[in-house]
């Protein structure tokens, strides 16, 4: 007889190899055909809601790993919340306006000069919508579930209308104003930039020390003294109108070889070193406070213009001379202090960064090229004391990567100062995963200047502002709401298609326009105002959503971006934060922690991972990262992730194979009647479940990743499943011992599949489809396992046993190395108590020790002789097992017998086989 035929071997159609790149699209097609997104919502309708509001990615270009990290993290959260019974709709969004799309069209050969603004904008819209379709497909391929058939898009008429209404409400509260102020200006983009659009890179700049002669000493300083200023922007010297000193700093008049120079005393050594002064020839002649120097008048070094000495608290002794070159047209601090002294705002630079006619002899020069011309002129006038070059961190345009300047231009602003405290209070009432997140956004809002919301471009939402014939600004509740209504009906392109009078309410009149003529604003809104309006355009307008959102989750760069603009517009109009909880993630780096770049050849993109390995590998990788900081990815890291995936898959497959003949409705054993080892595993499952649920609640996916591996490797592979083979394959099909184990195995399989479902979405679904007798058609429509109290005494007892088992395994390994045994079933184990542990007493309550240790025979005695090896949990001796090997179960037995034609079988196998014959 072939005894193999009598074994109950695992059976399942669940394949060993994942084949994810081919399998996943098939699973996704099924989800789409069944409209699983809405099915999941319907299941939880009327339950408590959970709203994760999607920050809109920019609709341009292919997805990078940062996109994947972001969307997969969001999907973990929404899927988990759904399986916990929450009504958790997820509406993905896209940010669609702005310069990159204009530039992309130009690169494609679209000549905007050959068409009207409205026509060019239409092409921008077409391009953005094409990009959305491409990105949408890629997001869905990652297994992200959401309302992709009806996403929110910032160019949709209803969204633009909501944005205009926010603008109107802010204007109504006096928070929107126009002013000529220095703003970040990008000559390469020909537009103003918000702080969120600035990034810092190293730049080589001229460093100059310049002497300003005293023109009117006011009886304070010597008439022939000179103030020394230091700057790294020589091109701004033509705009100088003042020298700022700190009112409380001490200043000295130093005689250096007959020349008298005024600088801060705290910086005198640094200045002397920079200007190569011989210290022996330096003499401090007079001392003043900055307050005493106020209103002294200096002479501009090469223009017929005075430079007034003024006081400012922004002056520091970190660098320079303590006498700060002040040009209100080219610096925020300069502008603010200049306002107090009613100084003129001079900014002779055009949109391209070129000097205008107001720049005199520098007219036509690009500002950076003018640096040399200015220093040459200063040298000619004898005012340049030192020219050097330094490399320093300097603001750049985040899109073009070119340097930006401060330039005073007429711009529209949203007042931060008027709502700053309200925003800070709202931040205090917001929850954060980590305290540094709160500190980061709090400090950014606290230190933030006014928000420049105007842009000198065409692809964006127009500022709904009109001008009367006399130049008066028209921005009333009536006019703004009328524009919002027009945008809601026609879209914002109507602004560029109609005359101003046709955009105003019918019969509108204004005293500043006696002839009934009006003009409209040509600037558009900052794209951060677009996305920052999503709480109104999406949360408050979509019936399935609600305001405020439970959560915003984006990259850490959004503390100064979307998180910031959203809370600003929300607090300004609604008085509360648009999010209750804020979570951020880091950036994706290569395996060595370097930034990915084509030049380094270290770029990994989602499409590549999905096609080569599958979306579930990308998702498992996300769960393996400490995403709060920057994360790493490489081929080697993905290989390690694939190895972990393979272990998870094979473990699930083993369990599937061994419950193929089990029906939980008819074959389950009540918990009270389970074998103790099975009750131990059931309690370990409950412990693992509680920990996993807690980790999901706290967004700690790395803990889940590690604990899943630990549970699979330590509890299942190394013990329970290995121990179980002797029972599942060998014992009688309906025996109590086998059904007891299958009862627990089935529970582990079902619960683990559910717990893994938010992460391994496709694999969990595939496992579910092969699991017999499950009630729900999809694991994603099932509920998470409930957290059940564990039997702690049982767990403690079995943890001690598992430690003893580790000692036995160490002893077996030694015996194997000494050729006493080969496989563990060839072993006979004798265990005795020792000074460290009373093993003989402890083991009296355990049955079938030979099965638990996966050996043939176990003997427990009170004491062993000196030949025994002492371990932490007893003295252990390993010998070769007595008797002969059973041909069916491979255990050694002294009772192999011949019953009829059944030879070389142990008593257990004889009994099982006889029942089959």
From Swiss-Prot:
Q: How is the cofactor bound?
A: Binds 1 zinc ion per subunit.
A single MF term (Gene Ontology): aminoacyl-tRNA deacylase activity
Subcellular location field: Cytoplasm
Which InterPro entries does its entry note? aa-tRNA-synth_I_CS, aa-tRNA-synth_Ia, Anticodon_Ile_BEm, Ile-tRNA-ligase, Ile-tRNA-ligase_type1, Ile-tRNA_ligase, M/V/L/I-tRNA-synth_anticd-bd, Rossmann-like_a/b/a_fold
- Does Iron appear among the keywords? no
'HIGH' region, short sequence motif: residues: 57-67
**Could you tell me the Gene Ontology terms of the biological process aspect for this record?**
isoleucyl-tRNA aminoacylation
Provide one Gene Ontology cellular component: cytosol
Q: What is its EC number?
A: 6.1.1.5
Q: Which reaction does it catalyse?
A: tRNA(Ile) + L-isoleucine + ATP = L-isoleucyl-tRNA(Ile) + AMP + diphosphate
What's the main place this protein lives? cytoplasm
- Is Lyase tagged as a keyword? no
Residues bound to ATP are: 598
Q: What does this protein do?
A: Catalyzes the attachment of isoleucine to tRNA(Ile). As IleRS can inadvertently accommodate and process structurally similar amino acids such as valine, to avoid such errors it has two additional distinct tRNA(Ile)-dependent editing activities. One activity is designated as 'pretransfer' editing and involves the hydrolysis of activated Val-AMP. The other activity is designated 'posttransfer' editing and involves deacylation of mischarged Val-tRNA(Ile).
Q: What is this protein called?
A: Isoleucine--tRNA ligase
Which organism does this record belong to?
Staphylococcus aureus (strain NCTC 8325 / PS 47)
């Amino acid at each position: 007889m072939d005894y193999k035929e009598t074994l109950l071997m695992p059976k399942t159609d669940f394949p060993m190899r994942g084949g994810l790149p081919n399998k996943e699209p098939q699973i996704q097609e099924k989800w789409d055909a069944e409209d699983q997104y809405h099915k999941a919502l319907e299941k939880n309708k009327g339950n408590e809601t959970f709203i994760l509001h999607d920050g809109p990615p920019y609709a341009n270009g292919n997805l990078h790993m940062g996109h994947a990290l972001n969307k997969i993290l969001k999907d973990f959260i929404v899927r988990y919340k759904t399986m916990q019974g929450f009504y958790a709709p997820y509406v993905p969004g896209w940010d669609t306006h702005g310069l990159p799309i204009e530039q992309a069209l130009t690169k494609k050969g679209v000549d905007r000069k050959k068409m009207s603004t409205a026509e060019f904008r239409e092409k921008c819209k077409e391009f953005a919508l094409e990009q959305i379709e491409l990105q949408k497909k890629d997001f869905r391929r990652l297994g992200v579930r959401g309302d992709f058939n009806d996403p929110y898009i910032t160019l949709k008429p209803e969204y633009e209308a909501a944005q205009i209404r926010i603008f109107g409400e802010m204007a109504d509260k006096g928070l929107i104003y126009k002013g000529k102020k220095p703003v970040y200006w990008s000559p390469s983009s020909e537009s103003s930039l918000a702080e969120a659009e600035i990034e810092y890179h190293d730049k080589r700049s001229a460093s100059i020390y310049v002497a300003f002669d005293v023109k009117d000493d006011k009886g304070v300083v010597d008439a022939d003294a000179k103030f020394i200023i230091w700057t790294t922007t020589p091109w701004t010297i033509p705009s100088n109108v003042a020298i700022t000193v700190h009112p409380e700093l001490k200043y000295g008049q130093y005689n250096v070889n007959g020349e008298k120079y005024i600088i801060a005393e705290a910086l005198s050594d640094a200045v002397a070193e920079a200007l190569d002064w011989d210290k022996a020839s330096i003499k401090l002649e007079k001392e003043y406070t900055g307050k005493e120097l106020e209103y002294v008048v200096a002479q501009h070094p090469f223009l017929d213009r005075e430079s007034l000495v003024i006081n400012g608290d922004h002056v520091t002794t970190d660098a320079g001379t303590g006498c700060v070159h002040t040009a209100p047209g080219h610096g925020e601090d300069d502008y603010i202090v200049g306002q107090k002294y009613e100084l003129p705002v001079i900014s002779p630079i055009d949109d391209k960064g070129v000097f205008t006619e107001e720049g005199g002899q520098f007219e036509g020069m690009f500002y950076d090229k003018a640096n040399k011309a200015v220093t040459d002129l200063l040298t000619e006038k004898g005012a340049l004391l030192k020219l050097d070059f330094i490399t320093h961190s300097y603001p750049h345009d985040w899109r073009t990567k070119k340097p930006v300047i401060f330039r005073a231009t007429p711009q529209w602003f949203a007042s931060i100062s008027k709502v700053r405290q309200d925003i800070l209070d709202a931040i205090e009432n917001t929850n954060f995963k980590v305290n540094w997140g709160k500190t980061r956004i709090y400090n950014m809002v606290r230190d933030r200047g006014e928000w420049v919301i105007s842009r000198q471009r065409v692809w964006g939402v127009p500022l709904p502002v009109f001008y009367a014939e006399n130049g008066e600004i028209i921005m009333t509740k009536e006019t703004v709401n009328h524009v919002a209504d027009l945008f809601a009906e026609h879209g914002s392109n109507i602004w560029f298609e109609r005359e101003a009078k046709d955009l105003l309410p019918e019969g509108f009149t204004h005293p500043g326009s006696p002839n009934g003529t009006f003009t409209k604003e040509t600037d558009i809104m900052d794209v951060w105002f677009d996305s920052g309006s999503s709480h109104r355009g999406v949360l408050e307008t979509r019936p399935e959503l609600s305001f405020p959102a439970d959560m915003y989750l984006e990259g850490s760069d959004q503390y100064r971006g979307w998180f910031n603009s959203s809370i600003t517009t929300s607090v300004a109009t609604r008085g509360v934060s648009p999010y209750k909880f804020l979570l951020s993630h880091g950036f994706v780096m290569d395996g060595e922690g370097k930034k990915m770049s084509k030049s380094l050849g270290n770029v990994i993109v989602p499409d590549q991972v999905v096609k080569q390995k599958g979306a579930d590998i990308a998702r498992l990788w996300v769960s393996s990262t400490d995403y709060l900081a920057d994360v790493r990815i490489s081929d080697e890291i993905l290989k390690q992730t694939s190895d972990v995936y393979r272990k998870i898959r094979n473990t699930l497959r083993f369990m599937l194979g061994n419950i193929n003949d089990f029906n939980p409705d008819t074959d389950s054993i009540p918990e009270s009647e389970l074998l103790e080892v099975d009750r131990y595993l059931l309690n370990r499952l409950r412990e693992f479940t509680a920990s996993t649920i807690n980790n999901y609640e706290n967004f700690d996916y790395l803990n889940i990743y590690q604990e899943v591996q630990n549970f699979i490797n330590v509890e299942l592979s190394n013990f329970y499943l290995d121990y179980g083979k002797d029972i599942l394959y060998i014992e009688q099909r309906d025996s109590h011992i086998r059904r007891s184990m299958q009862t627990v195995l089935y529970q582990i399989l079902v619960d683990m599949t559910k717990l893994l479902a938010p992460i391994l979405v496709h694999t969990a679904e595939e496992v579910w489809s092969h699991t017999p007798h499950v009630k729900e058609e999809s694991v994603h429509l099932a509920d998470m396992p409930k957290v059940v109290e564990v039997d702690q005494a049982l767990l403690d007892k079995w943890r001690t046993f598992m430690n003893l088992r580790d000692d036995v395994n160490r002893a077996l390994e030694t015996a194997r190395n000494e050729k006493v045994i080969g496989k563990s079933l060839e072993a006979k184990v004798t265990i005795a108590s020792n000074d460290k542990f009373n093993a003989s007493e402890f083991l009296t309550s355990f049955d079938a020790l030979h099965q638990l240790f996966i050996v043939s025979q176990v003997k427990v005695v009170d004491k062993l002789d000196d030949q025994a090896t002492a371990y932490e949990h007893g003295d252990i001796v390993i010998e070769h097992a007595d008797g002969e090997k059973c041909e069916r179960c491979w255990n050694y037995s002294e009772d192999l017998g011949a019953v009829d034609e059944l030879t070389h079988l142990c008593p257990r196998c004889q009994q099982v086989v006889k029942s089959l014959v």
